[in-house]
């Protein structure tokens, strides 16, 4: 079976990584994982994923916010869609920008945790279709 696309999952929650890696692989995606923003940036450079699923808050002040800023301001990677997943958006007042306004977090879509696999797959398929159509 050929791959539907290369997906990078970045989250410090190993249970989240294991569960969603299995879901994505079962639906035809090639999956790479990283447990920190630093490791995620290395994986982006080596794997050139078609999309990134990114946790907002990780340990040791290693936030998805910083990761997304680095990706979306790099000419080589800025077109890679980012699907942000978080359990803190409502509680902390984080705002997500689906536009490049310079103030909000740069992401292409977001989901609240816990993430339902069918919703994750639907959103991911939509992001990948938009990216293909834009080429």
Could you tell me what each predicted segment is?
Residues 42, 65-78:
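Short amphipathic alpha-helix used as the core "switch/output" element in two-component signaling
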Residues 1-6, 116-135:
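Non-catalytic signal-transmission and effector/linker regions of two-component phosphorelay proteins
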Residues 62-66, 88-111, 118, 122:
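Alpha4 helix (beta4-alpha4-beta5 surface) of REC/receiver domains from two-component response regulators
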Residues 47-54, 58:
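Active-site beta3 strand of CheY-like receiver
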Residues 14-32:
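Two-component/phosphorelay signaling modules centered on CheY-like receiver
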Residues 33-42, 63-64:
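Helix N-cap/capping motif at the beta->alpha junctions
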Residues 48-50, 76-81:
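His-Asp phosphorelay/catalytic-motif detector in bacterial-type signaling
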